[in-house]
From Swiss-Prot:
Protein's name according to its UniProt entry: Small ribosomal subunit protein uS13
A single GO BP: translation
InterPro entries: Rbsml_uS13_C (IPR027437), Ribosomal_uS13 (IPR001892), Ribosomal_uS13-like_H2TH (IPR010979), Ribosomal_uS13_bac-type (IPR019980), Ribosomal_uS13_CS (IPR018269)
Chain segments carrying region Disordered: 94-120
Organism: Azoarcus sp. (strain BH72)
Family, as annotated: Belongs to the universal ribosomal protein uS13 family.
Keyword RNA-binding among record annotations: yes
Assigned keywords, A-Z: Ribonucleoprotein, Ribosomal protein, RNA-binding, rRNA-binding, tRNA-binding
A cellular component annotation (GO) from this entry: small ribosomal subunit
Function recorded in the entry: Located at the top of the head of the 30S subunit, it contacts several helices of the 16S rRNA. In the 70S ribosome it contacts the 23S rRNA (bridge B1a) and protein L5 of the 50S subunit (bridge B1b), connecting the 2 subunits; these bridges are implicated in subunit movement. Contacts the tRNAs in the A and P-sites.
Assembly, per entry: Part of the 30S ribosomal subunit. Forms a loose heterodimer with protein S19. Forms two bridges to the 50S subunit in the 70S ribosome.
HAMAP family assigned to the protein according to its UniProt record, in alphabetical order: Ribosomal_uS13
PANTHER family the record matches: 30S RIBOSOMAL PROTEIN S13/40S RIBOSOMAL PROTEIN S18 (PTHR10871), SMALL RIBOSOMAL SUBUNIT PROTEIN US13M (PTHR10871:SF1)
Molecular function per GO: rRNA binding; structural constituent of ribosome; tRNA binding
Amino acid sequence: MARIAGVNIPNHKHAEIALTAIYGIGRSRAQKICDAAGVVRSAKIKDLTESDMEKLRDEVGRFVVEGDLRREVTMNIKRLMDLGCYRGVRHRRGLPLRGQRTRTNARTRKGPRKAIAGKK
């Protein structure tokens, strides 16, 4: 398995798909990386030369991916919580942020229902 940005890239997949194993790289960004590196999108990772892999590593290195991106997202959420703004309060309480209703639904964000004693 090849390693790019500290992630093992699957050998049996096409370059375009294999790059999506890296956190922060989706299909469209993977296509742009392949084009910029001059690598054929449909080429399997195991068939690429070491120079092709080096080009891919250089192109991926231009983006914020993996640990740095996770840290950045976490810090952004922490900043909102420290500010005490509406979105930060919703993060702190574990409720939806974007205006969804919470009287019913919102179970994914709120977690499983809490049993109410004496109900029935």
